[in-house]
């Protein structure tokens, strides 16, 4: 599309103007629609999406050029018309609902128009007028005379299907008979399907570790005097309430039950507030040369520390109960584990505060974490509080999201390890981490300030807040002598103020409801050879280098020179597998896929893994969970098979950087191997943020289906080495026009130019389907065909009708997913000015026009009314286009044969070489035309009414069918909360009458608005996505929170209704 620097904000020599929000502007917007847009709107909706996108870009360029040449009137006209294209014409166009790479261009164009800050008033005015237009269109049937409904999608009643579900397979040939007899259910049955609601969440639903007491005992946690051990339980979040403190209490520990018995209500906590999960270290950060730091006898001890760290937490209300007490706060050593720049501008106020830079925990020379506490003590030797840390009753450390996103290793665990294993300064208490970190502390203080009227500045140091600046100015006025010169005054005002003295006000007893818990039962000692623990199942062979923790030095008395690194690695692998060799390991699969399905822990065997929400990343987490459940897609990246399809280095030296595919593979491997844990997708998010900084990860909420399109588009570009893809997926290059019931010549022309010409990839084999759009003139029988591909099928939700209940009350009927598909594929009869301007018999056609001449007719809008340069589709203009992922800019040129812009770059290099439409419209006399007239019989049809039938058919459907329900209106501020009933088994009929049968395995739900809403997902984690009762395994994923959901359908309940369902994932199955 456009270059990155286009836009008035990036052109210092362009002086933008800002139209006022006025009645005059409103009249200008309305006049342009009624005098110009309205006349062309019906015809423009029938144009190819790619042509509309190119013309919208042209209008934006015309707007910039008019501003540059000081023509504000022309600039305003071009911008208003461009807005109508972006927010009205394109979303209502014929090909918009089939989402392919062209959709990514549309989203970027939309952002360019919205990012013109000086034209914000114009955008608001246009959106308001579009709302009026669409409301009128709904009242008058959108110009559609009537619909011819075709039952292209259906599901069968439960009684007919329950006996067939078990026979479904993923391996046999597709059935040919769709058998419509008895397949449509009654409305009463649809209304009786259960309405799904999110399950109630409990404390243990937040994943910590995949450890079951009966499977993995923990001898390292036994107290010396005890004869029996208490199994380690996953730690839980504590109640988000302040703690009680009574002045006559002498001990906190005497009032507390054991820490492991404290429970909490997860529903009152927030998914974003927890840092308490598994931190993964990218294997790329650890050199294989440092593998000799591992010791096979130390694995059990490291896992013990890992468990203890996850249990050693303190909530923000509990820390507040300590810091608000004049006696207990002196017993706390608070460690700010953040980069110094962050600590300098804000931190928790405490009498004994130490800032430890996480970068100090990494040895840059050896590229490993430091493993001796005396190294850290030497670096912090001037800090008396840290040196005397063993004299404190409480040691609490905290971090924040920005530091976590900056540091690439698990600094929290390294710090915990150094503190707990220190021989020089043994601690009397276990260090605890502040649950939720700085962000949770800040949120808690704001809550208390509103409820209890505490002063935030007494507990939070923020020198640049408004209140702090006022206090600073008052202190300077009181302390500054009159004789001080102005230079000194200016210098002192620029310094960062010192933290306030510790004098918090006394708080009412009602604010302190519970004292903090004592440390966990006991602290493991550091033996020479610690007791062994059964390890988590590790990756076989090549993938075994992925480690959950940085290397920790060995303490076994073995000389390093006696063993080389290969021997140590071999011993380590033998030790890791000795407990599971006969139970778990199977013959090695192709591409070294690790095998864990036989684990007795269901969370491990099914790889049920939570994902950390680092701010507003729930839209990414929910989509990743569904993609991870798509077996074909998951295997491609877990097996590393994807590497054989990466783009080779180019002759000119430039090449694709396969960052996204590599980071997705690493993320999938972590999720696969760490069932029962919550994984932090830091590396993956960093790559996405690098490729698409406009998404503003992790701060802004985005549309999850737009993220899916970005992900699939990029993966397609990276995995498009044509030679290897063609060898492994020859089906992508082959087709049988007769079997597909398509016109051989027209389809072949489109297929060669757009499918093969644009490049193929494994993503196409999994997600790509094909559509046929046709326009048939009922007056002369002339028909034009247009083909396109899609990754996501975006469906509008039909308007709900009212029905009377048995009690005589009117209720809104639910909408079936099959109805959404059938409305999408139904034939539309267009008449009057909404009819297609047939090039043979339409208003602009010449009676003497021959059929041969018509076949070369360019696809542009024509009308009796004279058009200005704003409305002619500029698809042949030579110009530059934006490479969305930094691959460079290319020039387009015209083909000699048609009016469509052709690009010489490879498929993955050009955003305009999309799966949009054919290079030219194919035309023929339709075989089912009733008239069958040609130009020689023009007198026979000249007196007939001009009527057009618009038809959409599925030519092919993908292995994984992704359906997006379009719940948000054009301006994304309103949401359609209609209850949609969706089936577990879905049948869709192709154009050739073959029936494709699909099985539901994933759902993305959305609650709230697009800006302030929340995404969750439902996934059938059964390895074969079985829907039989007792075998289906539906799990509800809310970031790190995971819960089994037994209400989400089975072979006895094949339909589910929900007002939150947003994206559905279906997998093709065969009888």
UniProtKB/Swiss-Prot annotation:
Listed GO biological process terms: protein deubiquitination; proteolysis; regulation of protein stability
Hydrolase recorded as keyword: yes
EC number: 3.4.19.12
Location in the cell: Cytoplasm
GO CC aspect terms: cytoplasm; cytosol; nucleus
Domain USP stretches: 609-1069
Keyword Calcium attributed: no
Catalytic residues identified in the record: 618 (nucleophile), 1014 (proton acceptor)
Composition skew (Polar residues), residue ranges: 481-495, 920-932
Disulfide bonds: none
Compositional bias per record (Pro residues), positions renumbered to this chain: 497-507, 516-532
Described purpose of this protein according to its UniProt entry: Involved in the sorting of ubiquitinated cargo proteins at the multivesicular body (MVB).
Recorded family membership: Belongs to the peptidase C19 family.
Additional notes on this entry: Present with 606 molecules/cell in log phase SD medium.
Protein name: Ubiquitin carboxyl-terminal hydrolase 7
Naturally occurring in which organism (per UniProt): Saccharomyces cerevisiae (strain ATCC 204508 / S288c)
């Amino acid at each position: 599309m456009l270059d990155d620097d286009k836009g008035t904000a990036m052109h210092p020599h362009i002086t933008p103007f800002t139209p006022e929000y006025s009645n005059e502007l409103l009249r200008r917007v309305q006049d342009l629609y009624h005098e110009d847009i309205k006349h062309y709107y019906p015809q423009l909706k029938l144009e190819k999406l790619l042509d509309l996108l190119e013309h919208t870009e042209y209008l934006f360029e015309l707007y910039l050029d008019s501003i540059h040449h000081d023509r504000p009137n022309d600039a305003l006209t071009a911008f208003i018309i461009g807005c109508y294209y972006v927010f009205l014409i394109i979303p209502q166009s014929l090909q918009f609902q089939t989402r392919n790479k062209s959709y990514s261009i549309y989203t970027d164009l939309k952002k360019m128009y919205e990012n013109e800050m000086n034209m914000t008033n114009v955008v608001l005015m246009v959106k308001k007028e579009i709302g009026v237009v669409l409301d009128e269109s709904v009242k008058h049937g959108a110009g559609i005379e009537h619909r011819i409904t075709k039952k292209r999608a259906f599901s069968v009643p439960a009684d007919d299907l329950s006996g067939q579900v078990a026979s479904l397979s993923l391996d046999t040939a597709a059935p040919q008979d769709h058998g419509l007899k008895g397949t449509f259910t009654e409305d009463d049955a649809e209304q009786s399907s259960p309405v799904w609601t999110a399950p109630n969440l409990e404390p243990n639903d937040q994943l910590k570790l995949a450890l079951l007491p009966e499977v993995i005992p923990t001898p390292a946690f036994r107290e010396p005097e005890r004869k029996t051990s208490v199994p380690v339980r996953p730690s839980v979040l504590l109640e988000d309430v302040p703690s009680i403190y009574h002045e006559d209490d002498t001990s906190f520990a005497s009032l507390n039950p054991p820490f492991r018995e404290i429970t909490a209500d997860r529903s009152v906590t927030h998914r974003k507030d927890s840092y308490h999960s598994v931190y993964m270290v990218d294997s790329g950060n650890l050199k294989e040369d440092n593998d000799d730091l591992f010791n096979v006898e130390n694995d059990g001890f490291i896992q013990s520390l890992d468990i203890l760290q996850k249990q050693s937490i303190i909530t923000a209300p509990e820390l507040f109960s300590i810091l608000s007490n004049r006696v207990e706060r002196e017993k706390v050593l608070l460690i700010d584990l953040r980069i110094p720049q962050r600590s300098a501008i804000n931190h928790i106020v405490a009498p004994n505060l130490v800032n430890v830079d996480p970068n100090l925990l990494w040895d840059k020379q050896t590229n490993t974490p430091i493993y001796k506490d005396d190294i850290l003590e030497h670096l912090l030797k001037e800090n008396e509080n840290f040196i005397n840390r063993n004299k404190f009753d409480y040691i609490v450390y905290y971090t924040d999201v920005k530091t976590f996103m900056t540091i690439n290793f698990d600094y929290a665990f390294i710090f915990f390890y150094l503190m707990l294993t220190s021989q020089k300064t043994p601690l009397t208490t276990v260090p605890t981490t502040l649950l939720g970190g700085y962000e949770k502390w800040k949120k808690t203080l704001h809550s208390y300030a509103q409820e209890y009227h505490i002063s935030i500045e007494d507990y939070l140091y923020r020198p640049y807040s408004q209140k702090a600046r006022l206090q600073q100015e008052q202190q300077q006025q009181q302390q500054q002598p009159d004789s001080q010169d102005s230079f000194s005054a200016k210098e002192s005002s620029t310094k960062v103020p010192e933290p306030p003295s510790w004098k918090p006000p006394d708080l009412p007893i009602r604010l302190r409801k519970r004292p903090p818990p004592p440390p966990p039962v006991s602290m493991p000692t550091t033996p020479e050879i610690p007791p062994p623990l059964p390890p988590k199942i590790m990756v076989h062979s090549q993938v075994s280098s992925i480690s959950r923790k940085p290397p920790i030095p060995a303490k076994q008395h073995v000389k390093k020179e006696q063993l080389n690194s290969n021997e140590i690695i071999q011993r380590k692998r033998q030790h890791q597998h000795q407990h599971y060799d006969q139970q778990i390991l199977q013959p090695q699969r192709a591409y070294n896929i690790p095998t864990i399905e036989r684990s007795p822990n269901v969370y491990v065997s099914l790889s049920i893994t939570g994902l950390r929400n680092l701010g507003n990343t729930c839209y990414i987490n929910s989509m990743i969970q569904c993609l991870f459940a798509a077996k074909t897609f998951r295997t491609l990246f877990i097996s590393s098979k994807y590497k054989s399809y990466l783009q080779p280095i180019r002759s000119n030296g430039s090449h694709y950087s396969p960052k996204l595919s590599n980071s997705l593979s690493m993320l999938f491997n972590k999720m696969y191997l760490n069932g029962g844990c919550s994984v932090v997708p830091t590396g993956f998010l960093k790559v996405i943020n690098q490729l698409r900084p406009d998404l503003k990860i992790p701060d802004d909420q985005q549309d999850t289906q737009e993220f899916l399109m970005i992900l699939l588009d990029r993966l397609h570009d990276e995995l498009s080495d044509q030679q290897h893809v063609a060898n492994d997926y020859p089906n992508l290059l082959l087709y049988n026009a007769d079997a597909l019931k398509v016109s051989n010549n027209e389809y072949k022309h489109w297929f060669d130019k757009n499918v093969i010409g644009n490049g193929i990839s494994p993503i196409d084999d999994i997600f790509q389907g094909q559509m046929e759009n046709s326009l048939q003139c009922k007056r002369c029988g002339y028909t034009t065909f247009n083909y396109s591909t899609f990754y996501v099928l975006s469906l509008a939700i039909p308007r709900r009708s009212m029905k009377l209940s048995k009690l005589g009350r009117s209720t809104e009927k639910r909408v079936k997913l099959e109805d959404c598909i059938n409305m999408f594929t139904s034939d539309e009869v267009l008449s009057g000015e909404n009819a297609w301007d047939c090039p043979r018999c339409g208003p602009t056609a010449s009676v003497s026009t021959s059929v041969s001449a018509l076949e070369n007719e360019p696809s542009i809008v024509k009308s009796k009314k004279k058009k200005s340069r704003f409305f002619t589709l500029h698809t042949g203009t030579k110009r530059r286009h934006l490479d969305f992922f930094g691959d460079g800019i290319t020039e387009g040129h015209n083909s000699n044969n048609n009016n469509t812009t052709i690009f010489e770059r490879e498929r993955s290099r050009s955003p305009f070489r999309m799966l949009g439409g054919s290079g030219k419209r194919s035309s023929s006399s339709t075989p089912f035309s009733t008239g069958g007239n040609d130009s020689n019989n023009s007198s026979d049809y000249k007196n007939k009414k001009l009527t057009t039938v618009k038809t959409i058919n599925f030519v092919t459907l993908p292995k994984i069918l992704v359906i997006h329900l379009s719940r948000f209106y054009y301006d994304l501020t309103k949401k359609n909360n209609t209850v949609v009933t969706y089936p577990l088994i879905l049948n869709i009929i192709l154009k050739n009458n073959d029936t494709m049968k699909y099985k539901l395995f994933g759902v993305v739900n959305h609650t709230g608005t697009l800006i302030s809403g929340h995404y969750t997902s439902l996934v059938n984690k059964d390895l074969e996505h079985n829907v039989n009762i007792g075998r289906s395994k539906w799990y509800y994923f809310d970031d790190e929170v995971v819960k089994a959901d037994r209400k989400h359908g089975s072979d006895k309940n094949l339909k589910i209704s929900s007002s939150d369902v947003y994206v559905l994932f279906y997998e093709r199955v065969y009888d």
